[in-house]
Swiss-Prot record:
Name by which UniProt lists this protein: Xaa-Pro dipeptidyl-peptidase
Gene assigned in the entry: pepX
Family statement: Belongs to the peptidase S15 family.
Pfam families: Peptidase_S15, PepX_C, PepX_N
Subcellular location(s) per record: Cytoplasm
Gene Ontology MF: a single term: aminopeptidase activity
Any GO BP: proteolysis
Enzyme class: hydrolase
Function: Removes N-terminal dipeptides sequentially from polypeptides having unsubstituted N-termini provided that the penultimate residue is proline.
Main location: cytoplasm
Entry's EC annotation: 3.4.14.11
Catalytic function, reaction form: Hydrolyzes Xaa-Pro-|- bonds to release unblocked, N-terminal dipeptides from substrates including Ala-Pro-|-p-nitroanilide and (sequentially) Tyr-Pro-|-Phe-Pro-|-Gly-Pro-|-Ile
A GO-annotated cellular component: cytoplasm
Length: 757
């Protein structure tokens, strides 16, 4: 384990003493260090009647147990302090470590022995081996009462609200959109779990079209075959209009009553970060949105009608929209328990909705935590003039996602009444998708949140993985740079795939978000501020560093690609083409081994490099015909240890999100040997070589100069490493699978790779 502590806040000494005293640690500034440590430990072991026993089973050094040490005349030393501290954090002395000073350096332990009271205070705020901070572990065990009131420690809310005796209710928010054109505003179901409290509380809201269930069968039927010819497009400039949103006004009167009438029973799934905040005094709201089970309207996937309906939930929390008790719209209930302050959470589609909501500038949205969220839907299902699929989901497109998330069809009555209209709407969507050309058009323009990024007022926290080929890193990169300069923005850029990171051992992500939301939503005045970029070092396990920016580097390193011309044959023998189509993983393996139709260029790294931003290929290239698809991947090549993209379980159900509440696994990205690691990749239709909005002719056998930016990333390379650039045509996981007989030729002498560093 390595310690990477970003959540700790330096408080004045009087605050430290006061907070310790409130938790029963009655330490005196004038006492000697040894006496203070003993006083601290006897309170620490509050679950024991006889505190001599837990002291006797800890060690001060290799010869002395802690009780014997306190009964001796020996002085407290730094070595003894560290030895005790590591044991309190769950490490076994003489098993996990033998020399505390060596272990302190190996783990990056954040505490430097000096002022003992401040050391102990920071120790309580430090994560244990099993994933909780020490103070959270003690509170979970009953250190302070579960009194349904707020208690703070180091600028973070503690788990002092009951997660058993909570209010569980359902309301139906009246949106300002009418997606199915029935003349009534769409209703959106809101599932609420909130702690009991006499005052007003903030809300954690997760906007998830998946929450009420998904129609997997209908979605699977809507998948496309990726086999087909790359279309030759007529040259033209793509014209666009400013997206429009038509809103509807509230209709009719509704009796105001005191409480919701529908009780929330089981929910499909909760998000463990939300679970963590519930006993800390934050309401949990789950909203599936228009076109989902128990709501009304069509599934408009990603457009501002969908976003508006989610926004209206925040409006209701602030008294600007109504919520009915049921679908009759006869009775309404106010969110009189809400303080109006909201944070959004969730990954993938959920993080996408956070991005979209932020761009409305809605009052009350204080923080978004957008994890692996889409910023422009074109870049999810298309790339540079190509029809593409999200990584791992070949054949998926917007209409199959619509079928997946239109969960109203899971209710037989809704299916009978509404499926015909839903299918008619879906046909319109299919026509607008334009799978023939892969070009950007008005449909995608209406789902581009970057256009409204200037409206963002909330503080923004992103998480994204360098190995996320589902929602690719371009999404967070573009959103990060599109935000207004005065906005506080933060990015946790890890080396995983499309995954959550709130239960990783190496980073205090939950505690950092607690500090932020306690400040922004509960009004605690602290100096807490996350760094702009928190990056997971790819060269070592469990190592995180603070950076000033994502991209924007002034320096670069250029690699020449060779001296000769090389060709890429597009067509495969039928047997190989069929085999790769059935198992794209086999294609990826053989591509990395140099066995596919490709140009492979190994580039020695002659000095340490820290890639930060978008690698760019400048290529002199020609096609043997009037079309061309170019794929590129940049690998770090060579057998060595690399961080793996998916977290592994270190210990099962050891993270406590409250008081024995929603226990979850402690995880981490493994660090183990592999033959290579993908650094970045990209795909380009050569007819869109100059600009996404410009379609140009390709003249057979005529040289073209192409600038091709790959996916943004942050990646460290050391002298002696090897980069491998792979250029090819069809990618059997991502692109259309065109097996026509043509080839691309690259003049390597007139081509180069540039890395921002």
């Amino acid at each position: 384990m390595r310690f990477n502590q970003y959540s700790y806040i330096n408080f004045p000494k009087e605050n430290v003493l006061s907070e310790l005293k409130k938790c029963g640690f009655d330490l005196q500034n004038t006492a000697n260090h040894k006496d203070s440590l003993e006083t601290f430990l006897r309170r620490f072991f509050f679950t024991y009647q006889d505190t001599n026993y837990p002291l006797s089973i800890l060690a001060a050094d290799k010869k002395t147990d802690l009780l014997t040490f306190f009964q001796s005349e020996d002085e407290l030393t730094a070595d003894i302090f560290y030895t005790v501290a590591f044991q309190l954090l769950g490490f076994s002395y003489l098993v996990d470590f033998e020399d505390s000073d060596v272990f302190r350096k190996e783990t990056g332990f954040p505490i430097i022995y000096g002022d003992l009271i401040e050391n102990l205070y920071q120790l309580l705020n430090t994560r244990t081996k099993k994933g909780n901070t020490l103070i959270d572990q003690l509170v979970s065990d009953g250190l302070i009462p579960e009194d349904n009131d707020y208690h703070y420690f180091n600028g973070k809310s503690l788990a002092t609200f009951s997660n058993q005796d909570v209010i569980r209710e359902v309301v139906y928010v009246e949106s300002r959109v009418d997606t199915d054109q029935k003349g009534l505003s769409d209703l959106v179901k809101v599932s609420i779990i909130r702690p009991r409290f006499d005052g007003k509380i903030p809300a954690i809201m997760t906007a998830s079209p998946y929450h009420q269930g998904t129609n997997d069968k209908a979605s699977d039927k809507a998948l496309y075959k990726m086999e087909g010819e790359l279309k030759v497009k007529l040259p033209h400039k793509i014209e666009l209009e400013k997206p429009q949103l038509n809103l509807v006004q509230p209709q009719g009167q509704a009796e105001l009553i005191a409480e919701a009438e529908e009780k929330l029973t089981h929910i499909n799934s909760s998000y463990t970060l939300n679970d963590y905040f519930l006993p800390r005094g934050f309401a949990n709201l789950y909203v599936s949105g228009v076109g989902t089970k128990d709501s009304t309207g069509f599934m408009t996937n990603g457009d501002y009608q969908q976003i508006e309906a989610y926004k209206n939930v925040i409006d209701w929390l602030n008294g600007r929209c109504r919520a009915f008790t049921d679908h009759t719209r006869q009775r309404q209930v106010k969110a009189d328990w809400s303080n109006g302050k909201v944070a959004t959470t969730g990954l993938s589609y959920l993080g996408t909705m956070s991005n979209g909501l932020a761009t409305t500038g809605v009052d009350g949205l204080e923080v978004i935590i957008a994890e692996a969220g889409i910023s422009s839907w074109y870049n999810y299902y298309r790339e540079n003039g190509l029809v593409t699929s999200p990584g791992g989901y070949p054949g998926e497109d917007f209409d199959s996602l619509a079928e997946l998330t239109y969960s109203r069809n899971l209710l037989a009555g809704d299916y009978i009444r509404g499926n015909e209209a839903h299918q008619a709407d879906l046909e319109k969507v299919k026509a607008q998708l334009d799978r023939k050309t892969g070009d950007y058009n008005q449909f995608w323009h209406d789902r581009n949140y970057l256009l409204n990024a200037h409206k963002v007022k909330a503080e923004v926290v992103f998480t994204h993985g360098s190995q996320d080929w589902n929602v690719k890193p371009l999404h967070v990169y573009q959103m990060f740079h599109a935000l207004p300069t005065h906005i506080h923005k933060h990015l946790f850029f890890h080396n995983g795939a499309h995954v959550y990171m709130n239960n990783w051992q190496s980073i205090d992500f939950r505690e950092s978000i607690n500090a932020l939301l306690t400040k922004k939503l509960l009004g605690q005045e602290t100096d807490f501020q996350l760094p702009t970029v928190i990056w997971q070092d790819n060269t070592a396990p469990q190592t995180w560093l603070s950076l000033d920016n994502f991209g924007g580097q002034e320096n670069c390193k250029t690699f020449s690609l060779g001296q000769e011309e090389q060709a890429i044959q597009n067509q495969y023998p039928d047997k190989d083409f069929e085999r790769y189509g059935k198992t794209y993983q086999a294609f990826n393996t053989e591509l990395y081994q140099g066995k596919a139709n490709q140009i492979t260029i190994n580039l020695p790294v002659t000095k340490d490099l820290h890639l930060n931003g978008r690698a760019q290929l400048n290529l002199r290239i020609k096609s043997s015909t009037n079309k061309g698809l170019l794929s590129a991947q940049l690998l770090e090549f060579g057998q060595k240890k690399y961080l793996q993209p998916y977290p592994a379980i270190l210990s099962a159900r050891t993270i406590d999100n409250g008081r024995y509440h929603m226990l979850e696994n402690l995880c981490e990205l493994p660090f183990r040997p592999e033959a290579q690691r993908v650094v970045t990749k990209g795909y380009l239709n050569l007819q869109n070589r100059s600009d996404l909005l410009l379609v140009e002719d390709i003249t057979a056998d005529e040289w073209m100069d192409v600038q091709f930016e790959l996916q943004p990333t942050i990646y460290k390379l050391k002298e002696g490493d090897t980069l491998r650039l792979v250029l090819y045509t069809t990618d059997f996981e991502i692109t259309i699978r065109d097996n026509t007989d043509y080839h691309l030729t690259v003049d390597l002498a007139q081509s180069m790779l540039t890395l921002p560093c």
